[in-house]
Amino acid sequence: MTRVKRGNVARKRRKKVLKLAKGFRGSHAILFRTAKQQVLKALKYAYIGRKNRKRNYRSLWIVRINAAVRPYGITYNEFIKQLKNSSIALNRKMLSQLAILDHSVFKTILDSCTPGFK
């Protein structure tokens, strides 16, 4: 059997994991074995968090649009249906931004897609 020298490789691998674990509390930032476990867990949580962020923003946009159309006597659901029927291609993020920042443009969109709800 030949001798396998992998000191550099092992050190680089450990340093990489410990660098990712920087800022963790206690032994999770110092000991390689626990740091490795915590890094894997943190990466898993980060992945889940990226998915949840998209979900949260979409629900926030829906709430904002609903709050903007309610004073005109229409619900969010009816508004989206009327948008689809009048083939206005604006996504929820854009509609939410218009409702907050440029209310007059949002009102014209509302009037153009819902003529019966005035």
Curated annotation (Swiss-Prot):
GO molecular function, one term: structural constituent of ribosome
Subcellular location(s) of the protein: Plastid, Chloroplast
Keyword tRNA-binding attributed: no
Biological process terms in GO annotation: ribosomal large subunit assembly; translation
Keyword line: Chloroplast, Plastid, Ribonucleoprotein, Ribosomal protein, RNA-binding, rRNA-binding
Annotated Gene Ontology cellular component terms: chloroplast; ribonucleoprotein complex; ribosome
Domain of life of the native organism: Eukaryota
Family listed: Belongs to the bacterial ribosomal protein bL20 family.
Role this protein plays: Binds directly to 23S ribosomal RNA and is necessary for the in vitro assembly process of the 50S ribosomal subunit. It is not involved in the protein synthesizing functions of that subunit.
Protein's name in the database: Large ribosomal subunit protein bL20c
Species annotation: Gracilaria tenuistipitata var. liui
Gene: rpl20
